[in-house]
Amino acid sequence: MLNPIVRKFQYGQHTVTLETGMMARQATAAVMVSMDDTAVFVTVVGQKKAKPGQDFFPLTVNYQERTYAAGRIPGSFFRREGRPSEGETLIARLIDRPIRPLFPEGFVNEVQVIATVVSVNPQVNPDIVAMIGASAALSLSGIPFNGPIGAARVGYINDQYVLNPTQDELKESKLDLVVAGTEAAVLMVESEAELLSEDQMLGAVVFGHEQQQVVIQNINELVKEAGKPRWDWQPEPVNEALNARVAALAEARLSDAYRITDKQERYAQVDVIKSETIATLLAEDETLDENELGEILHAIEKNVVRSRVLAGEPRIDGREKDMIRGLDVRTGVLPRTHGSALFTRGETQALVTATLGTARDAQVLDELMGERTDTFLFHYNFPPYSVGETGMVGSPKRREIGHGRLAKRGVLAVMPDMDKFPYTVRVVSEITESNGSSSMASVCGASLALMDAGVPIKAAVAGIAMGLVKEGDNYVVLSDILGDEDHLGDMDFKVAGSRDGISALQMDIKIEGITKEIMQVALNQAKGARLHILGVMEQAINAPRGDISEFAPRIHTIKINPDKIKDVIGKGGSVIRALTEETGTTIEIEDDGTVKIAATDGEKAKNAIRRIEEITAEIEVGRVYNGKVTRIVDFGAFVAIGGGKEGLVHISQIADKRVEKVTDYLQMGQEVPVKVLEVDRQGRIRLSIKEATEQSQPAAAPEAPAAEQGE
């Protein structure tokens, strides 16, 4: 009954298994892909008929991680998986981006890809496995798909490229790059790097593409054995007469409209032309399909913009191919934030803030690969007003999560180490205007805001979006693309980095035939653009401010004897809780005795440090301290001498004469000098007021052990 078909092959240091025909036989196609115990089950379902009036391709990619894959039960209240995490959303996008361009134009049948992680080896990230599974399932399904694709992760360790590095190897790597493509062409790159050169990044892309050919070959072999018949799908025949009629009415007018440099004005004019053209044609023949007319008009728009670029004419906004739009850079624009910047590039604008917090503010991520703490948070918000529209405002959408992660990757390489700058840092980018590459504007704004906040970043970083228009062997690479150029072009190519190298690279290619040489031209052109933007940014602020904001918490660090940690924490946390409440500070203690005190007020921090030093102070026998009477008993009085330590003054040690009644000499709360006579094995302290008053030396406060103290 069950007849599994299996293919095994070696992929770098891992063994990959593709299995189909065993499960989910009612899906259009299903594949179980495993790579060294990390297994992802991928299904594809395609509808044989498109919905009437459907004018876009409804492809959905869902990626879901099951905690049973790692032998765990979810920690949520309901003890089951809920909405997708940020990590799951990012991997769903990673799968979607290289497969979407491979469906034929005009194909609008609904297709859903579901990738479920069912087993995980902590050393093998499921994302590459899921991408291979999606490629295999689509290739097996018979759905019109111009694949398969391969996928590879590339690391860079000891000046060598490493194929599909393990999680441990990635910690040593200067690069984390994912590349996907067909046999002939690269389609997608997603990466972060420790400021590598253009040549090193391009080498990694080429290396990954070469290595993934084994995946493509094995998927093709599996399809020969188990593939379903290819769907008999044909695109709608082109109505040449209608195309010519629409072009006659609209092409010249659209060509003129695309010389309007202001985005909103241009959009308004284009909308008028489209509406009037459609109205004219429907008046001539009411049986015409309005959606079809819209598609023809869109194709004319695309052709107008592309042909003008290829002919060497100025772009939509009048720029040459390698020109950057006008820049406006401002820092310190919000008075009470810890750091802020307003970065404007043409009609794209980002208001970016940086906020400093303590280690307690770090985000704890409960991931399938294990729990980790993130001390650098980057959030990107894209409100509808940024493009002059109305819309829903709420939790971030897939696009916002993806753009935020890309911008974070651009900045991560220059962030200081926690031991040098022990703060959790949150950057928020509010896109206030958008016309192309708001994610790269967020990188520039983040660099400025972090410097304004006094975060000692290693270098300033900037980002730029590149585009490509290609027809045959003729191509033009565009710097700093507009939204329209992104939409109508063949490649979206985003590069972020410093003067020294690249920190993030993202490529999405919509056509085949992008060669290594074209990518080289784009990278070199992007470098020139990046250096130009950095030059303008450096005029506004060229180094991190010498001090953090007065409104940011200052972290003071002292070192105590690890044996004394229990004294500072107290029973059930009572001492540290009282300390934080009474001093108005935040206190964190590490196992090695490092104590971090965070406060916006320096005096509060000093008070907390003094009290911690008192608690951890060693009591010195023979020394005189100032104490306070805390309890009176028949045989003497208990006196607190600081740091939560209390000793007994026996009735015989109160005065140099016989004392009948303790209360004749001492009252509750009275401050008295006391001399330490003895500290016994159990830590009990014997004190004397009599001997303290006889001594001429002044009373002392408890002395703290030598401490490393810094800010």
From Swiss-Prot:
Q: Domain S1 motif, which positions?
A: 622-690
Which SUPFAM superfamilies does the record cross-reference, listed alphabetically? Eukaryotic type KH-domain (KH-domain type I) (SSF54791), Nucleic acid-binding proteins (SSF50249), Polynucleotide phosphorylase/guanosine pentaphosphate synthase (PNPase/GPSI), domain 3 (SSF46915), Ribonuclease PH domain 2-like (SSF55666), Ribosomal protein S5 domain 2-like (SSF54211)
InterPro entries cross-referenced by the UniProt entry? ExoRNase_PH_dom1 (IPR001247), ExoRNase_PH_dom2 (IPR015847), ExoRNase_PH_dom2_sf (IPR036345), KH_dom (IPR004087), KH_dom_type_1 (IPR004088), KH_dom_type_1_sf (IPR036612), NA-bd_OB-fold (IPR012340), PNPase (IPR012162)
Give me the residues that bind Mg(2+), please.
Answer: D486, D492
The chain positions of domain KH read 553-612
What binding partners and quaternary form does the record give?
Component of the RNA degradosome, which is a multiprotein complex involved in RNA processing and mRNA degradation.
Output this protein's name: Polyribonucleotide nucleotidyltransferase
Q: Encoded by which gene?
A: pnp
